[in-house]
Structures are given as structure tokens and as C-alpha cells.
Amino acid sequence: EVNKSHQKEDLFLWKQADPTVSAAFHYLAAQLYKHERDFANFYKSGILYLAYVDCMTLGEDVAQELAVDLALAALLGENVFNFAEFLAHPISKFISKESKSEFGWLLDMVQVFNDGDLNAYDELCEKYADQLNAQPALVMHERKLREKITILAFLRIVFELPAEKREIELADIAVRTKLSVDGVEFLLMKTLSAGLIEGEIDEVSSKVVVTWAQPRILLKPEIQELADRLDQWIQKVS
């Protein structure tokens, strides 16, 4: 019994590892993934690294470089569809327009992806064409970026609806995503296969019924939007 007690105590101490060790581990992992151009795992490791360090102590140049790398990884990472961890973290301020960073356009782009706003995305692509073309990875993956923002535009439709009323006409999705109905069906299959939603496509009535959507971290404006919708619902039922 005494030995078991010591074993549990040792395990507890192991789990409470020195934050500097954890920071070093995630930093090295992030650098490895960056070298391998594994955007999704770099993003994950970079965010975990920031959980163990104060980005304000990194130095402005280092922090800005990390912010740029994370923003690019968020956009380019396979199956990275939640950007709130980055947008809500102080590291993002190092590429904000308020900080007079030349990469303010990149933060705008991440925000547009988080919002699932296709129209704003098209506007930014036109407005910041020179900056986008100066980033080879973004140019190389232009088609994937378009596919990703389109999926996010659809997810935005889903999140705007009450959980019990997520029956959506394919024609309505086509308008919001700028796709044909056939394109919408392909989009839905991609979204289902990525595990972002669960549901069924009713081809007879040209509808999709979404029974579950992957939870997402909300930013303050999105929380306020939910609160406003709740107030409206309370007013209707009272």
C-alpha cells in the first residue's frame, strides 16, 4: 500500500512538469513541424507552446514572427477550422493594425475565415493581392483556401440556426457559398467526412438535416450574438 501511495505521488509530480520543460518540448515540436511544412501540427504545437510562456517576454521581433507563422498555419492547416484560440491570444496583437504591423492584412484574413464570410474574403483577396502573392504558401494552396473558406461559410449558416431547426435548403446554401447545387452536395460530403457535422442529405427534397456540429470556441462578438438571440427567444416565449 505504501509503494502504491508513492507511485501515485510520483505520477502526480510527473504530471506537474516544470512549465519551462513543457514550453521547450512544444517549441521544439513546433520548429520540427515548421521545417516539415506540417501546418496543422505546427499550429497545434505553437498554441500549446503559448500556454506555457508569456508572449510579451519573447521580444517584439520573435513574437511577430511567431504570430505570422501561426496565422499562416491556421489558414493552411488541414482540418484547422477553429481560429479563436489564436485570435483571442495576445500573440495576435503583434500583427494587428494597432501595432502598425505590415501583417495587419494577415490578421484580417484569419478573422474573415473565423467569420466564414466569403464576400469579405473575396474583397480581401482583391485588396491585398500584392501581399498575398508575396506569400508562396498561400499562392500554392489558393484552391484549398477557397475550399476551406467555403466550408466555413456553410458552418456559419449552421451555427446561426437553433440546434433543433438545422434543416437547410441546398439552394440557400448555394447562395451563401456561391456554389451550384451539385457543388453544395460535394461541399456537404467534404464537411461530413471531415467530422465537422453529422446529419443526412435529403436529395429528394434538396435539403440537409444537421443533427450535430463540432463545438467551437467563441469570441466575445459571437458570445454577444448568442446572448442577443437568447433574449429574442425569451421575448417570444414570454
Q: What is the predicted function of each stretch?
A:
Residues E1-A51, C55-S238:
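Charged, E/D/K/R/S-rich low-complexity terminal regions of large eukaryotic assembly subunits
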